[in-house]
């Protein structure tokens, strides 16, 4: 079974490669393929990293307040 780190790396690599890059100075912005909204690759990478609990590996991501808190004890 693949480790969480290798799965995370593969997902992030796939997302980075799926971004259509444009030349600097072009009036267009980078867009995720198949979408019309102008979003840079950083937001998609940060969302994925924060969801997987790996946001600390990317200094440009701010995952504060995005973590789901799971308690190991049951409420009585």
UniProtKB/Swiss-Prot annotation:
Signal peptide (from-to): 1-27
Transmembrane segments: none
Propeptide: 28-39, 65-76
Coiled-coil residues: none
Localization: Secreted
GO molecular function: acetylcholine receptor inhibitor activity; potassium channel regulator activity; toxin activity
Modified residues (Asparagine amide): 64
Tissue-level expression: Expressed by the venom duct.
Disulfide bridge partners, by residue number: 46-61, 50-63
Key words of the record: Acetylcholine receptor inhibiting toxin, Amidation, Disulfide bond, Ion channel impairing toxin, Neurotoxin, Postsynaptic neurotoxin, Potassium channel impairing toxin, Secreted, Signal, Toxin, Voltage-gated potassium channel impairing toxin
Location, primary (coarse class): secreted
Cellular component, GO, one term: extracellular region
Keyword Signal: yes
Domain notes: The cysteine framework is XIV (C-C-C-C).
Entry similarity comment: Belongs to the conotoxin J superfamily.
Protein purpose: Highly inhibits both nicotinic acetylcholine receptors (neuronal (alpha-3/beta-4) and muscular (alpha-1/beta-1/epsilon/delta) subtypes) and the voltage-gated potassium channel Kv1.6/KCNA6 subtype.
Protein name: Alpha/kappa-conotoxin-like pl14.1
Organism: Conus planorbis
